[in-house]
Amino acid sequence: MRVDDFDFELPPELIARRPLAERSSSRLLCLDAETGEINHRGFKDLLGMVNPGDLLVFNDTRVIPARLFGQKRSGGKVEVMVERVVSMTEMLAHVRASKAPKPGVEILIEENYVLTMVEREGDLFRLRVSQGGSVSELLERCGHMPLPPYIDREDDLSDRERYQTVYSRQPGAVAAPTAGLHFDEALLLAMSQKGVETAFVTLHVGAGTFQPVRVDVVQDHQMHSEYLEVSADVCERVRQVKAAGGRVVAVGTTAVRALETASRSGSIEPYAGDTSIFIYPGYEFVTVDALVTNFHLPKSTLLMLVSAFAGREHILAAYQEAIEQRYRFFSYGDAMFLHRRQSGLEDAGAN
């Protein structure tokens, strides 16, 4: 299976660079993965597509203001993108500079903070806050929201609210679980009043989610690693919903990856740790029955995941329809609602 099989042409003006004024006013493309039938709805119409007894599973990670700008003592400019906070004073980060910093090099962040390079760990750098306080304090005071590169603008204060789900509560992500951005408090309340259940997993989305696939053959791709937690309570609720004939509806590809990682044994079990699960066509889903998701980049691992879920041909046809109907794409864009395609329809693959 080739990466080029997941390519499509997107007019640049369809990339959403800012969110709509109202979260739930986005459009919703509904795809029947069995027939390929497409319906165009508003996101609020999702309320009529889920049933009492279904379980919506959200990723409650919270985006941290992970982008820092500073300079070396020699004057050279440095950009730091935090990948993971490892302690109160240390972080793993991507560093952009004219020369990669060596151990002991100091990076000045505004007037009050100094980062010291401790060591290199693969593509990442371990940095210590050696002056000014804790990592969380540094990020809160000096950090910028890590908007995806395709948004192509500087972040502003509104992004601190809008590039964040209303239910986020576990800080640690450097990218938002964007399918959840469409849910507002009113829609969540309406879901609850209808008898739709909700559960929360945590997967801290890493900067690797923005990295392009650099191989030609899908199976050769090495997936980045991200930390996740699926609790025993969530597992029990999943089992109960399925036993009663309800559906597990994942809100976003990160919720899919969390649930399916916890289901690698063939049934869902509590899980806490890193995952590098790579889902592409041929993967047999264990837990997830339906999926709310945004539109994804060409040739991306997320496009491969939704293709595994609903069939590549149906997905690409739906994307073409969305382009013709002028849907808004990517993080601040519109959404899709997919039903899982039956397994065995495409060549196998999952790592």
From Swiss-Prot:
Its EC number is 2.4.99.17. Pfam families: Queuosine_synth. InterPro entries: QueA, QueA_dom1, QueA_dom2, QueA_sf. The keyword S-adenosyl-L-methionine applies. Pathway: tRNA modification; tRNA-queuosine biosynthesis. SUPFAM superfamilies: QueA-like (SSF111337). Keywords: Cytoplasm, Queuosine biosynthesis, S-adenosyl-L-methionine, Transferase. It is an enzyme of class 2 (transferase). PANTHER family: S-ADENOSYLMETHIONINE:TRNA RIBOSYLTRANSFERASE-ISOMERASE. Transfers and isomerizes the ribose moiety from AdoMet to the 7-aminomethyl group of 7-deazaguanine (preQ1-tRNA) to give epoxyqueuosine (oQ-tRNA). Monomer. Belongs to the QueA family. This is S-adenosylmethionine:tRNA ribosyltransferase-isomerase. It comes from Hahella chejuensis (strain KCTC 2396).
